[in-house]
């Protein structure tokens, strides 16, 4: 086993431990409820796929797999882009229905508007956070791989 694979494995175990904690505290359910676009789960799926591919690359460091690393770097940037798309979508959700039929004299109506705005804002923030975290973790894996693997 190579040093790159062992370092990859340490990161995977750490991420799995964090995922178990997140699942235990019910944060996945909160993410599911907060993200109306579900882009966060697309980002999580991309992260899992790139982590598996990075582990494969770190286990078998042949020159024929160098092209695959370019796709992983691209996927890392795609996670950030999807996070930003989710941010825009969340703000659009927040502003699209925020002021329709707003009657400031009716307290219940104002509470409903604020609730709708909070839902759009939570979508925006959840997708941004998912995209940034997924991208950073993928980039860390790739830097470890490239610094500890010798392609002949």
Regions found by a protein language model. Name each.
Residues 1-152:
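Hydrophobic alpha-helical transmembrane segments of small proteolipidic membrane proteins, enriched
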């Amino acid at each position: 086993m190579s040093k790159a694979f062992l370092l990859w494995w340490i990161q995977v175990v750490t991420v799995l431990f964090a995922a178990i904690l997140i699942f235990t505290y019910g944060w996945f359910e909160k993410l599911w409820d907060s993200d109306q676009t579900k882009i966060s789960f697309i980002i999580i799926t991309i992260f899992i796929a790139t982590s598996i591919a990075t582990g494969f690359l770190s286990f078998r460091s042949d020159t024929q797999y160098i092209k695959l690393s370019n796709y992983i770097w691209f996927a890392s940037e795609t996670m950030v882009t999807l996070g930003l798309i989710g941010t825009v979508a969340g703000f659009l959700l927040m502003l699209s229905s925020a002021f329709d039929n707003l009657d400031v004299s009716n307290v219940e109506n104002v509470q409903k508007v604020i609730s709708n705005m909070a839902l759009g804002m939570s979508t925006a923030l959840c997708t941004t956070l998912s995209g940034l975290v997924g991208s950073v973790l993928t980039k860390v894996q790739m830097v470890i791989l490239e610094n500890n693997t010798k392609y002949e």
